[in-house]
Regions:
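Loop-to-transmembrane helix boundary motifs in multi-pass membrane proteins
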Residues: 123-127, 131, 158-162, 266-275, ...
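Extracellular loop-to-transmembrane helix junctions
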Residues: 1-19, 72-102, 111, 319, ...
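Hydrophobic, membrane-embedded alpha-helices of multi-pass small-molecule transporters
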Residues: 48-64, 201-207, 215-278, 321-333
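Extracellular/periplasmic helix-exit of transmembrane alpha-helices
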Residues: 202-212, 265-308, 378-382
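Membrane-interface "cap" regions at the ends of multi-pass membrane proteins
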Residues: 10-66, 259
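Hydrophobic alpha-helical segments and their helix-loop junctions in multi-pass secondary transporters
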Residues: 138-142, 146-161, 170-172, 191-218, ...
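Helix-loop-helix connectors at the membrane interface of multi-pass transporters/channels
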Residues: 107-121, 143-161, 249-272, 305-306, ...
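Helix-loop-helix module between adjacent transmembrane segments
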Residues: 10-11, 89-106, 110-174, 235-239, ...
Length: 472
């Protein structure tokens, strides 16, 4: 429990110390925000700061800080280090600066920002890449909550699939304050309750968790080498490119720029804490007899761990409330993913989104593609894993593009660009190595993949040095 407690304290200190430093680098000011300058009553409108935080937290959470942390815990105590350092120095910086850059550029989406700083050709690639990623999120986050709801209610799973998909359609189309602004705080309460309740259980039980000084060796070699596989497995709890597609939604609702640190940096730190709690619960589950206590096996899947631990530790009512939080996380990420896709396409096509007819013109093709991926997910026994594995790599690759965009911005503004350059180089190397070593890609040996990692790192650094020399 010592490593876990120190990790929690480190995340809190990271928000108050490093978060304040990153804010001072950006220098928020009193200029009008997009919510005021471009108010349209649909996507651009002022919302209360606490509500924006709740929505941002749910938008970025998904199942990543829960399922990802559970799967990542199997690697051992190294998961603690990645969650803490990744969250403070990479993920929260990525989320804050991408959100604030969107504010400064009128609330535009990620492809527009990438195009402005990395060029029009990169923007076109990013547009297709981002929309496909968001549609994958929509498809993946329909079926998994339907299974949990089916178990809770004993209703047919396909009925829940239909209900959630219909909700996606409505939430994607409606003004942001009509549905998302009203029900998200309730969903966020369930998710936060789950994390706080499990945190309390950990301190009451005081289990003998693996500590950092026990060694950082890979305790789950079947999942691949710690580098890069741990850094892809635990994404949303440390850094996630998907977040940069969600931050512009809230950038369009902020009253003033000073709200940025608690909303963007703070939501990421909160997500890191959720990931840390689940990684610790899972470490107890896998390594200290927790599996026997809740009546499950060491090889249980992430959803099985969630269900078993929630019901056993929190009782019937608490377990149901906790599971509702787990259900709310993917549903609320799925609907805002499709909403982001609509807005990104509308920006590219210059479609005014106030008339509902023009919203429909974009939404219908998006829903058709999402439904096809959903059908593949359901019809194939391994469909979820196939989509999820590609999503995991695509998600971190998106973070790479965002970090390089932020680095170019900081260089041009003559600000300390090192805060994004180091994460950009690291994540570029992670994604390149994963592409080499992963069975879903080239499946090369670890030795060859690490040689490729060195080449990717040196090439990326060389590209940056060459580009930087042209900026003086």
């Amino acid at each position: 429990m010592i490593s876990f407690t120190l990790s929690l304290i480190a995340l809190l200190l990271g928000y108050f110390l490093y978060g304040r430093f990153v804010e001072s680098v950006f220098k928020p000011d009193s200029r009008p925000t997009p919510a005021i300058a471009k108010a349209d009553g649909v996507d651009f409108m002022v919302l209360p700061g606490w509500k924006i935080f709740m929505i941002q937290f749910l938008n970025i959470a998904g199942t990543g800080p829960i399922f990802g942390a559970i799967m990542g815990a199997k690697f051992g105590p190294a998961a603690y280090l990645w969650i803490v350092f990744g969250c403070i120095f990479a993920g929260a910086v990525h989320d804050y600066l991408s959100g604030m850059l969107s504010v400064r550029h009128g609330g535009v989406g990620l492809p527009e920002l990438v195009g402005y700083y990395l060029g029009d050709n990169t923007k076109k690639v990013m547009l297709v890449f981002t929309v496909l990623l968001l549609v994958m999120v929509g498809a993946v986050f329909v079926y998994s909550p339907s299974i949990i709801l089916g178990d809770l209610t004993h209703w047919n799973v396909m009925l829940w699939v239909a209900v959630i998909f219909i909700y996606y359609i409505i939430a994607t189309m409606m003004p942001i304050d009509k549905i998302i602004g009203r029900i998200y705080p309730l969903f966020a309460f369930s998710l936060i309750f789950m994390a706080v309740a499990l945190l309390a259980c950990l301190f009451v039980k005081m289990p003998n968790l693996p500590e950092l000084w026990d060694g950082l060796e890979n305790r789950n070699p079947a999942a691949g080498p710690i580098f890069p596989c741990l850094f892809i497995t635990i994404a949303c709890g440390a850094i996630s490119g998907f977040h940069a597609t969600q931050s512009p939604l809230m950038a369009r609702c902020m009253k003033h720029e000073k709200q940025g640190r608690p909303i963007f940096y703070g939501a990421m730190i909160t997500e890191g804490m959720v990931a840390l709690v689940w990684a610790s619960v899972s470490a107890y589950f896998f390594y200290d007899g927790g599996a026997e206590e809740v009546g499950s096996t060491l090889k249980a899947s992430a959803p099985q761990v969630v269900t078993a631990v929630s019901n056993s530790w929190l009782g019937t009512f608490g377990g149901v409330l906790a599971l509702l939080g787990v259900v709310a996380a993917p549903i609320t990420s799925g609907d805002t993913a499709l909403r982001s896709a609509r807005l990104i396409v509308s920006e590219f096509l210059h479609f005014d989104q106030k008339p509902i007819a023009k919203r429909l013109m974009i939404c219908i093709p998006l829903f058709v593609v999402t439904s096809l991926l959903l059908w593949f997910n359901i019809a194939n026994e391994d469909g979820f894993n196939v989509i999820w594995n590609y999503f995991g790599w695509a998600n971190q690759t998106l973070a790479v593009f965002t970090l390089w965009t932020l680095t170019v911005y900081l260089v041009r503004q003559k600000k300390p660009y090192i805060i994004t350059l180091i994460p950009a180089l690291f994540m570029t190397t992670v994604c390149g190595t994963f592409l080499a070593v992963s069975p879903i890609a080239f499946g090369l040996s670890t030795t060859v993949s690490y040689i490729i990692a060195v080449v990717v790192f040196l090439f990326s650094l060389g590209w940056f040095v060459r580009w930087y020399s042209t900026q003086k």
